[in-house]
Swiss-Prot record:
Protein name: Superoxide dismutase [Mn]
Pfam family, any one: Sod_Fe_C
InterPro entries: Mn/Fe_SOD (IPR001189), Mn/Fe_SOD_BS (IPR019833), Mn/Fe_SOD_C (IPR019832), Mn/Fe_SOD_N (IPR019831), Mn/Fe_SOD_N_sf (IPR036324), SOD_C_sf (IPR036314)
Family: Belongs to the iron/manganese superoxide dismutase family.
GO cellular component: cytoplasm; periplasmic space
EC number: 1.15.1.1
Names of required cofactors: Mn(2+)
Cofactor binding note of this UniProt entry: Binds 1 Mn(2+) ion per subunit.
GO molecular function: metal ion binding; superoxide dismutase activity
Stretch forming the signal peptide: 1-23
Primary location recorded for the protein, binned into one broad class: periplasm
Binding residues annotated for Mn(2+), in chain numbering: H49, H100, D188, H192
Amino acid sequence: MTRSLKTTLILLASSVISMSALAEFKQAPLPYATNALQPAIDQQTMEIHYGKHHKAYVDNLNAQIKTYPELDKTDLIQLQKQISKYNTAVRNNGGGHFNHTFFWESLAATNKTGQPSPALVKQITQDFGSLDAFKQKFNEAASGRFGSGWAWLIVTPNGKLAVTSTPNQDNPLMDLSETKGTPLLGLDVWEHAYYLKYQNRRADYIKAFWSVVNWNKVNERYNEAIKK
């Protein structure tokens, strides 16, 4: 074997090893059983939404690592904050992976939802007038999002709370988001999130959502956000 051929084979092997060693984004297990959110969200919807839709976002995002090797060293939150550097596939699937991971953690069985903390209620009252007024504004954002997208409660850079919505799989962490902030609560209003149970009745899905909001997690996120 000539030295040049041997060198080529070594470099090729090194490249293969390097590619196979790239870290992949992982889909975390659901923090509850797929039937835990019934009757608000039915088991079949959860199985398809988590097991097929969310999984597809993770798989498709990992497929982009070959195009952008630096992704294997980028965590999911950091990816959102620099999403404009990447192509549409990374934006859609990276956003989809983050949004769904965030969404699952935003939900809990009705006996484990908790309540908004006094500190959060105080800020909600200051920025929206009351908890009910906040929910109404959030409902309007969710129902008013044309087509597919998300509704969000965020902490803005100036420390105030705001309700916003994003199209497709965008989110407020993205550097190209029209309204930026740290998300505390998000609602998926893509049809795949509710159509099996609610068909075209998005308003009924939004109403049911409030019975499974994980306020314990929202409180935790708020406490972290105001420290920054």
